């Protein structure tokens, strides 16, 4: 055991609020930059109350859910055409019920994967596309060549397909599962996008028009499954071929899972207000946003440890990020970073009180999470956390040096550092620690494997697209857009389009990583995909994480706070 590990295992827990009085903090009156973040719109008294006053699921609803679950299992076991089975799987997944039917879904998809005897999907655009998407999502490889039958001799998609809106929509969604170099899928995406955009306002079926509009705003593969489930439950209710058993179970299940999440939110809110970090004026106070992100990554009730530790580490991480970005001087940040590298509180007395509070909160919470993992999972994760925190803070330190030195790095250098500074290697490692098979498996995340590299790079670039206007106004660190502008002389508009193109290309690489990263299994592969989907949710239209009163508020409220009305039973 090295010295840092020994320190972590034996260090006493320090209550930072006993040692730091923010009201009399001597560095509070100094001329320091501020994040200018607005106060949280979420009432912390209300959030804390959710620990005991969350939505209680009645016993009769629990019994009804079990009854309906049995009926759905019967559906999976009943004889049906392959396309009908695919559509059943698709609806179950989109309704958010896949965690209840993991075995049935895998068996259904694997049987369809093996059954190529008569090519039942051949020439059927919707069937071919749905089969392609669902099997690739499940980790079963289907070649892009299955779409050649819809192309002419010059490689263009047949114009007759333009009248098949349902098929075009399925083709559009399937195209986002493509890999780098799969030109047929690139053509499919361009073709389907073009003709869906021109057709959706004239679609007679309201449910189909709603689905098309929703997909064009953001493809299914890029959406957060839990948020999508809330939207799809309402959309599915309006469809002519809606299955009432599936709909009723989806509503019950959504509320049951939400009740579990609410209790966790309440307990986490109680912890957060004891840290003192919620009182720091320069930093973001975003506990509920952090929970929403953990829920995006791992909403299944069985991932409680992953969710809670991601929120705890993530909430502290956000404050550390803001300290490096806008608060600390370069000398202070160098001392902070060296203390993290030593994983020691010995030198932090030289820091101003606010940075002492932040360091001790980080130190305490990380050791506390490590002890919880030791208790619940049976292995020592603290060395893994220390490596991740050192990597994290050194990336922040480098960005601070660029800022204080007025240096604009090349885009490639910025991106390699930025994929760490975005925080997702640390957060995904936190999630991995909560589900790893054993202690030896923790070695897989250092050095950073491709799966984490590309998911984190995507989150960095998506974040940059959404936050650059606000952060430029605050005088924050550079973003990829500015690095590209500086290196090429391009306008901001051109730079934005370039970064959007890079995002699309890196999604293709990540899609392939999900097949190539054999050292990782589910659910960690999905954790990585979902982290990027969370980035799309928070940053697709601006800074929905830092600005709490934004478009994200409605979705967060519907997913975390408001249950679905059940109506008459």
Curated annotation (Swiss-Prot):
Task: Cite the entry's keywords alphabetically.
Answer: Lyase, Magnesium, Manganese, Metal-binding
Q: Name one GO molecular function term.
A: magnesium ion binding
Report which superkingdom the organism of origin falls in. Eukaryota
- The record lists the membrane-crossing segments as none
The record lists its disulfide bonds as none
Coiled-coil residue spans: none
Provide the E.C. number(s) assigned to this enzyme. Answer: 4.2.3.82, 4.2.3.83, 4.2.3.81
How the cofactor binds, per note? Answer: Binds 3 Mg(2+) or Mn(2+) ions per subunit.
Q: What is this protein called?
A: Santalene synthase
So where does (2E)-geranyl diphosphate get bound?
284, 321, 325, 460
Family indicated by similarity: Belongs to the terpene synthase family. Tpsb subfamily.
UniProt keyword Phosphoprotein present: no
Which Pfam families did the record assign?
Terpene_synth, Terpene_synth_C
Q: Where is this motif: DDXXD motif?
A: 321-325
């Amino acid at each position: 055991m090295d010295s840092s590990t020994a320190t972590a295992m034996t260090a006493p827990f320090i209550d930072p609020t006993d040692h730091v009085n923010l009201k009399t903090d001597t560095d509070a009156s100094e001329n320091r930059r501020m994040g200018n973040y607005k106060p949280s719109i979420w009432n912390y008294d209300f959030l804390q109350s959710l620990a005991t006053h969350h939505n209680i699921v009645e016993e009769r609803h629990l019994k009804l859910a079990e009854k309906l679950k049995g009926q759905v299992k019967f559906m999976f076991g009943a004889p049906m055409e392959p396309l009908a089975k695919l559509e059943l799987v698709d609806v179950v997944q989109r309704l958010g019920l896949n965690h209840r039917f993991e075995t049935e879904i895998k068996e259904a998809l694997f049987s369809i994967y093996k059954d190529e005897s008569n090519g039942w999907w051949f020439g059927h655009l919707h069937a071919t596309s749905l089969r392609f998407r669902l099997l690739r999502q499940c980790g079963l490889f289907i070649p892009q060549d299955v779409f050649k039958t819809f192309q002419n001799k010059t490689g263009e998609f047949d114009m007759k397909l333009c009248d098949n809106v349902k098929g075009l929509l399925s083709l559009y969604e399937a195209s986002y599962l493509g890999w780098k170099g799969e030109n047929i899928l690139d053509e499919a995406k361009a073709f389907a996008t073009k003709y869906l955009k021109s057709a959706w306002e004239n679609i007679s079926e309201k449910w189909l028009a709603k689905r098309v509009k929703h997909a064009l705003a953001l493809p299914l593969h890029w959406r957060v499954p839990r948020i999508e489930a809330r939207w799809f439950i309402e959309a599915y209710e309006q469809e002519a071929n809606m299955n009432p058993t599936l709909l009723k179970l989806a509503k019950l299940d959504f509320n049951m899972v939400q009740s579990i999440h609410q209790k966790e939110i309440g307990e986490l809110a109680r912890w957060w207000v004891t840290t003192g970090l919620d009182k720091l004026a320069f930093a973001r106070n975003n506990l509920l946003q952090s929970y929403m992100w953990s829920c995006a990554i791992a909403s299944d009730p069985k991932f409680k440890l992953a969710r809670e530790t991601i929120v705890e580490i993530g909430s502290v991480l956000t404050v550390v990020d803001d300290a490096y970005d806008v608060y600390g001087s370069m000398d202070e940040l160098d001392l902070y970073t060296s203390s993290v590298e030593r994983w020691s509180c010995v030198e932090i007395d030289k820091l101003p009180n606010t940075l002492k509070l932040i360091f001790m909160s980080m130190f305490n919470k990380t050791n506390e999470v490590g002890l919880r993992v030791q208790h619940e999972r049976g292995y020592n994760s603290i060395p893994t956390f220390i490596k991740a925190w050192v990597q994290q803070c050194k990336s922040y330190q480098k960005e601070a040096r660029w800022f204080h030195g007025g240096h604009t790095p090349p885009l490639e250098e910025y991106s390699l550092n930025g994929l760490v500074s975005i925080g997702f290697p640390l957060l995904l490692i936190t999630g991995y620690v909560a589900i790893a098979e054993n202690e030896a498996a923790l070695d897989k995340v250092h050095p950073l494997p491709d799966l984490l590299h590309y998911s984190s790079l995507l989150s960095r670039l998506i974040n940059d697209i959404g936050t650059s206007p606000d952060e430029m106004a605050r005088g924050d660190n550079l973003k990829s857009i500015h690095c590209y502008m500086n290196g090429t002389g391009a306008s901001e508009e051109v730079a934005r389009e370039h970064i959007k193109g890079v995002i699309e290309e890196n999604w293709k690489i990540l899609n392939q990583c999900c097949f190539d990263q054999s050292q990782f299994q589910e659910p960690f592969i999905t954790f990585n995909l979902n982290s990027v989907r969370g980035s799309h949710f928070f940053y697709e239209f601006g800074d929905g994480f830092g600005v709490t009163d934004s478009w994200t508020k409605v979705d967060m409220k519907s997913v975390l706070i408001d249950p679905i009305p059940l109506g008459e039973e």
